Amino acid sequence: MLTIAGLVSILTAADTNALVKQATDLYLNRHQNSGYLEQSKVLFEKVLSQEPTNQEALWQLSRVYSSLGDCAQGNKTKLARYEWGKTLADSLIKINERHPEGHFWFMVNQGRIGQTRGVLNSLFMVPTIKKELKRTLELNPNHAGACDGWGSLYYELPGFAGGSLDKAIEWFKKGIALDPTYSLISVDLAKAYIKKKMFPEACAALVIVVNMQNPTYVADYIMDDKPEALKLQKEIEGK
């Protein structure tokens, strides 16, 4: 096992781009080892300690903190991690306002904060979330994740605050058209169909997830999306 001093020595000797790639690979393969997520964080933080304006490391570390928040125990820890993820994304926006991932991961972490606090306690966040989603798609019209973000927003909001299952489904379909193997979007589409009691359509979306080959985000698929799809299949069986 590497000592901390040995790790630091290796990191300071490595090329920044190689470090970013290594950290990215650890994150994308975190389903293979429970320690990879933390290791990814350490490497991205090392890059930023040497190069605080590294745009790739900023948005990627924001993504890492979103995942760290998702798996944290207790709302206090979750919120602290999402807040730091949002801060990192905001730093990127200030460096390069035209980087779509800065806006996207600011939105994701802000949205997670809202989900953790509860929708009714977070309605004041909605204009900011919409603004960041709109800007993400202005900068990258093919951003499937932003389409999922719009769909999730319309899915989760109560009707009096602008929620709409029809709009949610429309946005989820747009995202799937852009990236058919982005497994989370198909799960979210199925959940919207279930809420509308459109069970045959939900079943079809879930079958696609369960049988998906070469998902865009393998770790998300294995750790979250396929298990949730299987769970939802059981819940609506016979309906």
Q: What is the predicted role of each segment?
A:
Residues 42-49, 87-94, 134-138, 173-177, ...:
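Conserved structural position within tetratricopeptide repeats
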Residues 35-39, 72-87, 120-132, 160-174, ...:
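Structural signature of tandem alpha-helical TPR/SEL1-like repeats
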